[in-house]
Amino acid sequence: MDDNFTLQFSYKGISFQVYVILFGKNSNKQFTDSRSLTRLPFCIPTVCNYPFFAAVLGILETHNCAKEWLISNYLLPWCHKEPCVVPYWVDFRFGEEEKISEWCPLLNIDILSRDFIKKEYGSPIDAFKHFISQNRYAYISYNAYYVDDFWSKGEHRYPYKHQCLVLGYDDKQGHMLIADFFNGIYKTTKISYENFILAYDTYNQTNNIPQKNLTDEANDQSKTEYLNNLETLELEYGHEIKLLSLNQNSPKIDYMLMYGLTQDFINGTDTTIYTEYSINMQDKLSFGFEFFIEIRKYLQKCMAEKTHINLKPFYIIQKFNHVMKIRAEILQINNQHFLAEMDEALKYSSTILYTLMKYNIKKNDIQMKILEKYDSLTTLEFSIVKELSNILEACYLQNPSL
């Protein structure tokens, strides 16, 4: 039975749908949509952020080996200092995708070029069917124009590069099974062989930064160079195919990584994990406690102007606290003050997220109320992470066998 559910409601004659994801009861079974479907096991992950990291966590959770990796990470949120200027502007800190074996030792990665796949297999369909037979998931860039579920009913389509996980196929019905964010919800969907080939072949013939994902500020002349730099990085992304497979390594908690990320959170720095992207954009990003300050500025500005609030950072904050609770349970932390603050932070972050969902519909005046809650939450977050850092240093880092 699927523990996730869809909540439907209406306001002033307009219907809305919210997909609610519950943690902790992912099934390890292979779901069978039809008898002719061949697929790798996969489930909706606890945290649905950027498609690559959602895919990684979904693979680990469906094989029941995710908890150690989950609590070792998801500790350092970051955001662009110019919120919403690009679709990917807020997330948790991870290492480079190409070096996943370093920061997620449970998975192996093989990187193939599209030229190699064309030469070796001819058809991408044949290539991905072969990879699936080897128990390897394929992470690819594709043109979402050809995927129906990516768009709302009646929405104008345009070429748009996105990323998905290829995890199954059905020769009888003639479709591939992929996982991605479809209409704002991370899930699996089917795409016909014909449309899959079109989406695969035209992945880079797209508008890389579509106007619908930008704020008005992004059109200012002062941001032209900034956006051009990001667009150049985006154009270069996606030619390679990443093949992910589970290995035989045992799950382990990385206490040093956790400690380093807590220190970065407290200091608003990025010294534990290095990536080319963060080096190139280091003056444009905020981390940890500074992330919370930056998001407050964004929140206050949106409410003052009564504009739509992007909920991504508040989802990240809510999941930050959700994972913190899991972390406390696995580490068997019994500091009652810490646990009480953690529960309060999770409650605050959930309340803020759901209140802002309603605000985007009603545009009601909640500015003072929400900002007060957000400020209280920020204070709690700093206290919780500082205490976690102290606990890690006192109880775990002193033991070299861990």
Question: How should each PLM-predicted stretch be described?
Answer:
Residues I14-Y19, F23-G24, N28-G122, K223, ...:
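Cysteine-nucleophile protease catalytic domains, especially the papain-like/related folds used
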Residues H63-W89, E120-Q173, D180, L392:
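Active-site-adjacent substructure of cysteine-protease-like catalytic cores
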Residues Q17, Q163, T188-K190:
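Well-ordered beta-strand positions in beta-sheet-rich domains
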Residues E96-Y145, E234-L235, K242-Q248, I253-G260:
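Predominantly the structural core of cysteine protease catalytic domains
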Residues G13, D171-Y315:
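Noncatalytic regulatory segments and standalone regulatory/sensor domains
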Residues S245-L402:
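Charged low-complexity "KEKE/polyampholyte" interaction tracts
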